[in-house]
Amino acid sequence: MPEQQRLASLDSSTASRLPAYSQTLFEAKTEKGLTFEAIAQHLGRSEVAVAGLFYGQVQASAEDVDKLSELLSVPKEAIAKQMMGFPDRGRAGPMPPVEPLIYRLYEIVQNYGYAFKAVMNEKFGDGIMSAICFNTTVDKEVDETGASWVVITLKGKWLPFARF
């Protein structure tokens, strides 16, 4: 029997920290029964970028707003101004995170951050991985035992530190 599709929705404890349009988008997404993957296909963007739009962490283009308005049956005027403004990133949750899945990602950086840094430095030199010239994907793999595995790919441009 196929697994029933479940949709990500906006938790009331998070809503107050997000832009006003977030609730509008999440309600319309739920009403239409759409996944971030389906919305991403319509917008021609990655599903993580689209989820970022919903949480106010990614700036929308005029084309994004038009397509979201059409797909979700949300009046363009209700979302355009805020979505096309400059995002106020990094305010969606407390630090350190308390949501268990988000905390596990934080824990990965705590535990392996210096290891990632050391390996990147050896491969690329002194610098940083951009989170601006960046993309990411989330995929699902199922192993031979039937266990599900999460595959998160982080791809950022390497930015060497300038000598001055």
Swiss-Prot record:
Keyword Transcription: no
Gene Ontology biological-process annotations: cyanate metabolic process
InterPro entries named in the record: Cyanase, Cyanate_lyase_C, Cyanate_lyase_C_sf, Lambda_DNA-bd_dom_sf
Active site: 104, 107, 130
Pfam families named among the record's database cross-references: Cyanate_lyase
The reaction(s) this protein catalyses: cyanate + hydrogencarbonate + 3 H(+) = NH4(+) + 2 CO2
EC numbers on record: 4.2.1.104
Broad EC category: lyase
Keyword annotations from UniProtKB, A to Z: Lyase
An annotated Gene Ontology molecular function: cyanate hydratase activity
Gene3D superfamilies hit by this protein: Cyanate lyase, C-terminal domain (3.30.1160.10), lambda repressor-like DNA-binding domains (1.10.260.40)
Its biological purpose: Catalyzes the reaction of cyanate with bicarbonate to produce ammonia and carbon dioxide.
Protein name stated in the entry: Cyanate hydratase
Species of origin: Neurospora crassa (strain ATCC 24698 / 74-OR23-1A / CBS 708.71 / DSM 1257 / FGSC 987)
Gene, per the UniProt record: cyn1
